[in-house]
From Swiss-Prot:
Biased composition (Pro residues): 369-390, 410-421
UniProt name for this protein: E3 ubiquitin-protein ligase ICP0
A molecular function (GO) term: ubiquitin-protein transferase activity
Gene expressing this chain: ICP0
Subcellular location: Host cytoplasm; Host nucleus
Signal peptide limits: none
Region feature Disordered, mapped onto this chain: 1-112, 221-636
Length: 775
């Protein structure tokens, strides 16, 4: 007996089987059955339209973007005849299929009449998916909702790896992997790397669900991304009441608000002002401000699922941008908070207005660094708290930063008193001051510190020329400090600051005032290495250059002060630089003489410290380089590797660091591209090839060095692991002299044809091999 059209017959396992009559269009609708799923009664298709079915099913399918598109495109513009379908009469051809809008199928069609076991609706072809590996058929919206709660098949309770969708007659298909399950993560990642994934399902907490993921070079974006907002009215009220933050004052990227002044109007018509935080704080809890700056007003729609919340979020910014926005936030504020991380709520917004009452300076990346040699008695004028700007300055808007704060720390106009000793120094220092326009509290303090250093240099010039302001005096030159600075510290601190200034000028490309400024080609690398040496390894200067050095002692400072005081008056073109250079040179010479008298320090050269005059002896290496001293040294852990110097584009400088190690001298290895020292070669005796080349280049080295004629020990590398000599005779072998290398590994020596030794340093023929290898 064939069933009537419009009626369905239920099997005990819950799957209906429909066998319609030939040439009859059948539209079964299981939604018209009674509430009990076990009922066997046959009912007629009632007068319910697809609109009622859409309302009933919206709670389970509202979170899926593809379902919303399907319902909007197919069910929205078309209507359904409300009359009952009479038994045996085919429906009209233009009526869409019921239960999800499945198109009508002819009798004998394939598996288009499958019913989803979750929603008990007929599965539309474009919403059909098969679970893997159990291959049960469901609709995509139901499985995406189900899989977020439990990664198992609704029928057989098997762990699922991915969903198979979009199967074509040719056999191609796409997948929707489940990427957050630890048990099936590997198989799901393989599906993503294969390039078949068109969407992904994130199980567990949806607040941490990403919008896209990338595996194996393939990026998969979520077709229906989740949002951090909860989907129920109770959760909305509780969460938003706890994190509620008044909308004002807020900072926009273009016009940061000021304390005590109204923020400039934002493009889009937002009318929330800074002086209204109290009015905004009294907003009712029923319309709180969401984490994204929109007011959730459509609470009825939110209760049905994620779809309603998206509609309210889309409509809220448009409604809140009018002149009477109330608690709503304007478009400008929404744009300002669009770049915030997802999931971050109110506490990020509840910040004071920037630069209104904040005492911390703003550090700018391009500002010059603070001087590490700042005297402790010199205060920073820019660090004092400043009162808030007046209302007139605040109303100027974005034109606030530069012109408003520049006069706060700039020096007063030059008067006749302070500039009298050095009339030519002011035009030379004016362009430097004009370039350093302070941008924040930190840069203002640094600029003031530099101006104080220049004033100290001018005071040094005044003392050297016999003018007012000599040791301990308070002449006009001390009044040149900007912004009413405190009296300058003692003469030793002034000379120490003046000795540091030439190093900064030399780093910025200015001229070195020292008379002996000639430097070898490798001077920058040597100066950089010498600047990083501790005080125990390198002297404060060398060869009369005003290079970097350690802080001066009291005796050296007094000597440099007396030298600077007895110097002649400089020319007007370079007053400050000449005085600072003379003080640095005299300080270096005096401190070098004092250290040379002790006999334990060394002078500085372009390539590092050189031996000082006096008795010498073995001393520690500055870089803690040590050598094996015992005869029974432990062999190396693997095969010996040899890297040619030409392979790393480096050169060995034949300028030894005498007595830098316990047993020998060091030769620096310089990078040819940068000129920096990248490594050191340690000599252990005077008979090696490198020692021979060094002796030829520097004849006096053999008289100064303390190296022995022949090293008394050597490290024993391990023997080559393969015994047969035939394996060594391959195309990869490269003979170099009487040594044999295999891709950089030394494997043999003495004779390329006979290979009497596995390794030139092996214990069997070690002595003869070494002797022949050096010849």
């Amino acid at each position: 007996m064939e069933p009537r059209p419009g009626a369905s017959t239920r099997r005990p396992e819950g799957r209906p089987q429909r066998e319609p009559a030939p040439d009859v269009w059948v539209f079964p609708c299981d939604r018209d059955l009674p509430d009990s799923s076990d009922s066997e009664a046959e009912t007629e298709v009632g007068g319910r339209g697809d609109a009622d079915h859409h309302d009933d099913d919206s709670a389970s399918e509202a979170d899926s973007t593809d379902t919303e598109l399907f319902e909007t495109g197919l069910l929205g513009p078309q209507g359904v005849d409300g009359g009952a379908v009479s038994g045996g009469s085919p429906p009209r051809e233009e009526d869409p299929g019921s239960c999800g809008g499945a198109p009508p199928r002819e009798d004998g069609g394939s598996d288009e009449g499958d019913v989803c076991a979750v929603c008990t609706d007929e599965i539309a072809p474009h919403l059909r998916c098969d679970t893997f590996p159990c291959m049960h058929r469901f609709c995509i919206p139901c499985m995406k909702t189900w899989m977020q709660l439990r990664n198992t098949c609704p029928l057989c309770n098997a762990k699922l790896v991915y969903l198979i969708v979009g199967v074509t007659p040719s056999g191609s298909f796409s997948t929707i992997p489940i990427v957050n399950d630890p048990q099936t993560r590997m198989e799901a990642e393989e599906a993503v790397r294969a390039g078949t994934a068109v969407d992904f399902i994130w199980t567990g907490n949806q607040r941490f669900a990403p919008r896209y993921l990338t595996l194996g070079g393939h990026t998969v974006r979520a077709l229906s991304p989740t949002h951090p907002e909860p989907t129920t009215d109770e959760d909305d009220d509780d969460l938003d009441d706890a994190d509620y933050v008044p909308p004002a004052p807020r900072r926009t990227p273009r016009a940061p608000p000021r304390r005590g002044a109204a923020a400039p109007p934002v493009t889009g018509g937002a009318s929330h002002a800074a002086p209204q935080p109290a009015a905004a704080r009294t907003a009712p809890p029923s319309a709180p401000i969401g984490p994204h700056g929109s007011s959730n007003t459509n609470t009825t729609t939110n209760s049905s699922g994620g779809g309603g919340s998206r509609q309210s979020r889309a409509a809220a910014p448009r409604g809140a941008s009018g002149p009477s926005g109330g608690v709503g936030v304007g478009v400008g504020v929404v744009e300002a908070e669009a770049g915030r991380p997802r999931g971050r709520t109110g506490p990020l917004v509840n910040r004071p207005a920037p630069l209104a009452n904040n005492r911390d300076p703003i550090v700018i990346s391009d500002s010059p660094p603070a001087s590490p040699h700042r005297p402790p008695a010199a205060p920073m004028p820019g660090s004092a708290p400043r009162p808030g700007p007046p209302a007139s300055a605040a109303a100027s808007g974005p034109a606030r930063p530069r012109a408003a704060v520049a006069p706060c720390v700039r020096a007063p106009p030059p008067g006749p008193g302070p500039r009298a000793p050095a009339p030519g120094a002011e035009p030379a220092a004016r362009p430097a001051d004009a370039r350093r326009v302070p941008q924040s509290h930190s840069s203002l303090a640094q600029a003031a510190n530099q101006e104080q250093s220049l004033c100290r240099a001018r005071a040094t010039v005044a003392r050297g020329s016999g003018g007012p302001g000599v040791e301990g005096g308070h002449g006009p030159s001390r009044g040149a400090a900007p912004s009413g600075a405190a009296p300058l510290p003692s003469a030793a601190s002034v000379e120490q600051e003046a000795a540091v200034r030439p190093r900064k000028r030399r780093g910025s490309g200015q001229e070195n005032p020292s008379p002996q400024s000639t430097r070898p080609p490798l001077a920058p690398a040597g100066a950089k290495r010498a600047a990083t040496h501790p005080p125990s390894d390198s002297g404060p200067g060398g060869r009369g250059q005003g290079g970097p050095g350690t802080p001066l002692t009291s005796s050296a400072a007094s000597a440099s002060s007396s030298s600077a005081s007895s110097s002649s008056a400089p020319t007007p073109a370079g007053a400050a630089s000449s005085a600072a250079g003379a003080a640095s040179s005299s300080a270096s010479a005096s401190s070098g003489g004092a250290v040379g008298a002790l006999g334990g320090r060394q002078e500085e050269t372009s390539l590092g410290p050189r031996a000082a005059s006096g008795p010498r002896g073995p001393r520690k290496c500055a870089r803690k380089t040590r050598h094996a001293e015992t005869s029974g040294a432990v062999p190396a852990g693997g095969l010996t590797r040899y890297l040619p110097i030409s392979g790393v584009s480096s050169v060995v400088a034949l300028s030894p660091y005498v007595n830098k190690t316990i047993t020998g001298d060091c030769l620096p290895i310089l990078d040819m591209e940068t000129g920096n020292i990248g490594a050191y070669v340690v000599l252990v005796d005077q008979t090696g090839n490198m020692a021979t080349r060094l002796r030829a280049a520097v004849p006096g080295w053999s008289r100064r060095t303390l190296l022995p004629e022949t090293a008394g020990n050597h490290v024993m590398p391990p023997e080559y692991p393969t015994a047969p000599a035939s394996e060594w005779n391959s195309l990869w072998m490269t003979p170099v002299g009487n040594m044999l290398f295999d891709q950089g590994t030394l494997v043999g020596a003495l004779d390329f044809r006979s290979l009497r030794s596995r390794h030139p340093w092996s214990g069997e023929q070690g002595a003869s091999t070494r002797d022949e290898g050096k010849q």
